């Protein structure tokens, strides 16, 4: 019953508005999470991310706007979507803690920060959740922030647990990327890197076949197996995808499956960086 959105999803908080409308009369049934931090400006293809703003005043005004769009008086989990390179994380989290004190927010989260930043922020106000990319082809958090989350009692919330769609097996070449798809500019989805990464799918497909499941379901089952504090949030646009993801909960991977995954998907196995240099400078700060 966790719903995850952000003020930067769609133009002018459009996704938050959709969520707010959908939850009318049912708000109490869901844990509602949203985020702030990204700054967007008009571009040739709609509004585009141009920076990060973690100033206290901006965080307060962003929260007020999110509450209005979500049609609620409290946000269950409020994330700092990125750390502003010009504002100490402690200052941003301090402003967010004031929102908790005011009753507008129940708990705080961070998004793709380093272990050091996580610990500094947690010292200012308890951090309830850390959201970061994590999947079979992005296992680097196992060596950094995941141990810290276990130590501090922080939930680890993987986004893109299906490798931005790659682990579904639907994108094995550039022909699988439609015009306007943002992945067209992602390094891991370049023609050269896709050709190299496609070889990773064979062991995943073999294990999925053995379970009578789809590759995406087995990839999600692997993330779900990583610990009770790991709460993946796969993106879903279609009801069929939702049903498939729910079914992944019932897949029990064997020790042999896990060993095969470790051999086929060690940390750093994917060809290509996760982000372009322009976006990467805000990740893991």
List where the protein language model places each region:
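N-terminal binding-site loop/beta-alpha segment at the start of enzyme catalytic domains
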Residues: 1-34
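Glycine-centered flexible beta-alpha turn that most often forms the glycine-rich phosphate-binding loop
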Residues: 3, 75, 108
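Beta/alpha (TIM)-barrel catalytic core signal, keyed to glycine-rich beta->alpha loops juxtaposed to Asp/Glu
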Residues: 8, 83-264, 268, 278-285
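Acidic (Asp/Glu)-rich catalytic clusters
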Residues: 20-31, 67-71, 100, 121-125
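N-terminal small/glycine-rich loop or linker at the start of catalytic domains
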Residues: 33-50, 74, 79
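Active-site mouth loops of central-metabolism enzymes
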Residues: 45-60, 86
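Short, acidic/polar
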Residues: 54-70, 114-120
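Active-site groove signature of glycoside hydrolases
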Residues: 67-85
